[in-house]
Amino acid sequence: MSHNAPLVLMILDGWGYNENDRYNAIAKANTPQWDEWWQTCPHILLKASGLPVGLPDEQMGNSEVGHMHIGAGRVIQQDFTRINEAINNGKFAKNAVFHEVIDQLKKTEKSLHIMGLLSPGGVHSHEQHLFALLALCNQKKFRSVHLHLFLDGRDTPPQSALDSLKCLNEELAKHPVATINSICGRYYAMDRDKRWERVEPVYNLLTQGKSERQFPDAETAIHFYYKNKISDEFVPPTLIGKEHSIQDGDAVLFFNFRADRARQLTSTFLDPLFKGFERKTLPKLSCFVSMTQYDKNLFTTTAFPPVPLNNTLGEVLSSHGLSQLRIAETEKYAHVTFFFNGGCESVFTNEERIMVPSPQVATYDLQPEMSAHELTKTLIAAINSRDYHVIICNYANADMVGHTGNFEATVQAIECLDQCMQQVWQALKNNGGKLLITADHGNAEEMFSEATNQAHTAHTSEPVPFLYVGGGWHFTHSEGSLIDIAPSLLALLGITPPPEMTGRILLEKNHAHA
């Protein structure tokens, strides 16, 4: 099916723009290809955080939200904002799912196990959502509640769990309904790469109370781990206080609102064909509540079900008979597929997908190039095949290596990406193709926080670049936001964006001078 010059949309995950060169791994890196484009090709900056991407004002962007908005071409109220609003307008406290679960447990005299990421990060969860659940349990005079808390240190400073625990203890003083029964770093509880050896000890802790160490309270445990140079993200599964594991008839409530890092742990309880590891015990739960839908094949009771989206970029390309390829390494595969399609599981007609396995290393600063070279080879083969009108690809390095806080490794990651971009453009040029480059949010352009005097491992609220390589077109605006990408890409293809896409077309064809 050899037809056309492909258009590639390249998403450089975590590649933000920062005027300040200090602690900026992108500015520090040697990037001859990027520098040449920045001097000679049309480019502007796009907003990728806060209100323009459906998040609360000044909330940093993230990969899920970024890809959703790039694909949707309109502002989508994010689950985070939706849940915040429900708390503020009283709908959260009236949510029928929560009431039914608690009423059932009161009747059977069983326990509710609330688990999730205790964090003010707002990327996968927010601790205020947990506090609202505790207030609801208190309102309903239900006190058989056990907390299994995952620690962040990735979307927050590496050692910040004690601040969150202080806030939690203040809430528990007001609403004395629950005890903290386990803690665990997100590295273990929220893996998304089928590294079941990380998830298994979490499952054993939750279902059998098994743990290498036990502490009387969470603070003592965290002080012990900090003393041993273990930061929040890497705290091993640890029993706190008296053992209260999940028993038959109990209910579980997982309060994370973002799906990708909640799926695996959820599947250990709910997947009848689960093969990740041998489960010594499988509690017969009365209910498993997830804050949002994690996967349509995991039958959780969902407190905030998804709002369907029509006419995302993938659907529009498909309805115009165009072929498209989505390609990424494991870490970001869900982002260029599920999230890019508006949180929709289905694959459109003429949409193909390739996943390049991410390397099996403990943390990506140990291999800053990740699988970028393999991804580039596969991408170049796809360009040369001329089988696809549009290719949407994601390079994970700036984000995943940026999250480690290792500056030198992140510089290496950026330099590797520059070489990859150069090779991809060579192939596109040979095939008469065009290239759009952008990012979903910032990260690598700010690697150290003077405010906390710690590595800055989280995302940023900086704008992201939007760069066009291929000649013949120019930008008509000096800035935009992520929702303008899909309409602009459709304009390059000569397609009128559908009315659902409220983003603007930022690109215009150059006029030939008479």
From Swiss-Prot:
<keyword id="KW-0479">Metal-binding</keyword>
<dbReference type="InterPro" id="IPR011258">
    <property type="entry name" value="BPG-indep_PGM_N"/>
</dbReference>
<dbReference type="InterPro" id="IPR006124">
    <property type="entry name" value="Metalloenzyme"/>
</dbReference>
<feature type="active site" description="Phosphoserine intermediate">
    <location>
        <position position="63"/>
    </location>
</feature>
<feature type="binding site">
    <location>
        <position position="399"/>
    </location>
    <ligand>
        <name>Mn(2+) 1</name>
    </ligand>
</feature>
<feature type="binding site">
    <location>
        <position position="332"/>
    </location>
    <ligand>
        <name>substrate</name>
    </ligand>
</feature>
<dbReference type="InterPro" id="IPR005995">
    <property type="entry name" value="Pgm_bpd_ind"/>
</dbReference>
<keyword id="KW-0324">Glycolysis</keyword>
<comment type="subunit">
    <text>Monomer.</text>
</comment>
<dbReference type="GO" id="GO:0005829">
    <property type="term" value="C:cytosol"/>
</dbReference>
<feature type="binding site">
    <location>
        <position position="192"/>
    </location>
    <ligand>
        <name>substrate</name>
    </ligand>
</feature>
<dbReference type="GO" id="GO:0006096">
    <property type="term" value="P:glycolytic process"/>
</dbReference>
<feature type="binding site">
    <location>
        <position position="441"/>
    </location>
    <ligand>
        <name>Mn(2+) 2</name>
    </ligand>
</feature>
<dbReference type="GO" id="GO:0030145">
    <property type="term" value="F:manganese ion binding"/>
</dbReference>
<keyword id="KW-0464">Manganese</keyword>
<feature type="binding site">
    <location>
        <position position="63"/>
    </location>
    <ligand>
        <name>Mn(2+) 2</name>
    </ligand>
</feature>
<feature type="binding site">
    <location>
        <position position="403"/>
    </location>
    <ligand>
        <name>Mn(2+) 1</name>
    </ligand>
</feature>
<dbReference type="InterPro" id="IPR017850">
    <property type="entry name" value="Alkaline_phosphatase_core_sf"/>
</dbReference>
<feature type="binding site">
    <location>
        <position position="13"/>
    </location>
    <ligand>
        <name>Mn(2+) 2</name>
    </ligand>
</feature>
<feature type="binding site">
    <location>
        <position position="459"/>
    </location>
    <ligand>
        <name>Mn(2+) 1</name>
    </ligand>
</feature>
<feature type="binding site">
    <location>
        <begin position="154"/>
        <end position="155"/>
    </location>
    <ligand>
        <name>substrate</name>
    </ligand>
</feature>
<feature type="binding site">
    <location>
        <position position="124"/>
    </location>
    <ligand>
        <name>substrate</name>
    </ligand>
</feature>
<comment type="function">
    <text>Catalyzes the interconversion of 2-phosphoglycerate and 3-phosphoglycerate.</text>
</comment>
<feature type="binding site">
    <location>
        <begin position="258"/>
        <end position="261"/>
    </location>
    <ligand>
        <name>substrate</name>
    </ligand>
</feature>
<comment type="similarity">
    <text>Belongs to the BPG-independent phosphoglycerate mutase family.</text>
</comment>
<feature type="binding site">
    <location>
        <position position="186"/>
    </location>
    <ligand>
        <name>substrate</name>
    </ligand>
</feature>
<dbReference type="InterPro" id="IPR036646">
    <property type="entry name" value="PGAM_B_sf"/>
</dbReference>
<dbReference type="GO" id="GO:0006007">
    <property type="term" value="P:glucose catabolic process"/>
</dbReference>
<keyword id="KW-0413">Isomerase</keyword>
<dbReference type="Pfam" id="PF06415">
    <property type="entry name" value="iPGM_N"/>
</dbReference>
<protein>
    <recommendedName>
        <fullName>2,3-bisphosphoglycerate-independent phosphoglycerate mutase</fullName>
        <ecNumber>5.4.2.12</ecNumber>
    </recommendedName>
</protein>
<feature type="binding site">
    <location>
        <position position="440"/>
    </location>
    <ligand>
        <name>Mn(2+) 2</name>
    </ligand>
</feature>
<comment type="pathway">
    <text>Carbohydrate degradation; glycolysis; pyruvate from D-glyceraldehyde 3-phosphate: step 3/5.</text>
</comment>
<dbReference type="Pfam" id="PF01676">
    <property type="entry name" value="Metalloenzyme"/>
</dbReference>
<dbReference type="GO" id="GO:0004619">
    <property type="term" value="F:phosphoglycerate mutase activity"/>
</dbReference>
